[in-house]
């Protein structure tokens, strides 16, 4: 089973860019592995680093700013996660330490992949996201409270409501990925298999 997500309080980093695609999130040269770990080192590689090997940090990229080290909530603009349908993108984000991405909209495949990997994609309106960017930029180091059960983001003095599909919400709150969901029906699967002719097993 995956880690349960019910509530999270975390440092927010503002990535003020629209249409951030999966190749920017995790460039294709780092996709050779099939395990979910180790991708965080290459998250936003072409933006975070001045060299291809990822050894010279770019001081002008927001994730490298001292006040955002340890951030676990990413604030972004519309159409986050567009481009090719690589599951490595949420792998890289979670491996880096992100638990939540807040944006006005997400690419559909990235949105689904995020839930599969216990990364919570929160959709708020453009106006609400504008407010949050202004808040974060005026208060570097601010933390948000994200409550999946109540479907709320508490930021400063305001509370923002978001909506998550009930099934996906249930899965995240109970730490259920596709394997976990299957294991919930392990007894029924075993009983079904026991009834089948031997040549079918």
UniProtKB/Swiss-Prot annotation:
Alphabetical keyword list: Amino-acid biosynthesis, Branched-chain amino acid biosynthesis, Leucine biosynthesis, Lyase
Pfam family, one: Aconitase_C
E.C. designation(s): 4.2.1.33
Gene Ontology cellular component terms for the protein in this record: 3-isopropylmalate dehydratase complex
Gene Ontology molecular-function annotations: 3-isopropylmalate dehydratase activity
InterPro entries assigned: 3-IsopropMal_deHydase_ssu (IPR004431), Aconitase/3IPM_dehydase_swvl (IPR015928), AconitaseA/IPMdHydase_ssu_swvl (IPR000573), IPMI_Swivel (IPR033940), LeuD (IPR050075)
Catalytic activity line of the entry: (2R,3S)-3-isopropylmalate = (2S)-2-isopropylmalate
Gene Ontology biological-process annotations: L-leucine biosynthetic process
Pathway participation: Amino-acid biosynthesis; L-leucine biosynthesis; L-leucine from 3-methyl-2-oxobutanoate: step 2/4
Signal sequence segment: none
Top-level EC class as recorded in UniProt: lyase
Domain of life: Bacteria
Quaternary state and interactors: Heterodimer of LeuC and LeuD.
Family: Belongs to the LeuD family. LeuD type 1 subfamily.
Primary role: Catalyzes the isomerization between 2-isopropylmalate and 3-isopropylmalate, via the formation of 2-isopropylmaleate.
The protein's name in its UniProt record: 3-isopropylmalate dehydratase small subunit
Organism: Escherichia coli O9:H4 (strain HS)
């Amino acid at each position: 089973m995956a880690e349960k997500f019910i509530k999270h309080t975390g440092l927010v980093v503002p990535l003020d860019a629209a249409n951030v695609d999966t190749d920017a999130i995790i460039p294709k040269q780092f996709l050779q592995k099939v395990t979910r770990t180790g991708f965080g080192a290459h998250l936003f590689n072409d933006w975070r680093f001045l060299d291809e090997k990822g050894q010279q940090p770019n001081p002008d990229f927001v994730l490298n700013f001292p006040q955002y080290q340890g951030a676990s909530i990413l604030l972004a603009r519309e159409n986050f996660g567009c481009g090719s349908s690589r599951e490595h993108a949420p792998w890289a984000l979670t491996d880096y330490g992100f638990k939540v991405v807040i944006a006005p909209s997400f690419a559909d495949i990235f949105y689904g992949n995020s839930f599969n990997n216990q990364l919570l994609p929160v959709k708020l309106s453009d106006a609400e996201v504008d407010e949050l960017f202004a808040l974060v930029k005026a208060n570097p180091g601010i933390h948000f409270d994200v409550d999946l059960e109540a479907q709320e983001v508490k930021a400063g003095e305001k509370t923002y409501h978001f909506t998550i599909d009930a099934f996906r919400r249930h899965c995240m709150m109970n730490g259920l990925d596709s394997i976990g969901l299957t294991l919930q029906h392990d007894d029924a699967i075993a009983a079904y298999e026991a009834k089948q002719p031997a040549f079918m097993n």
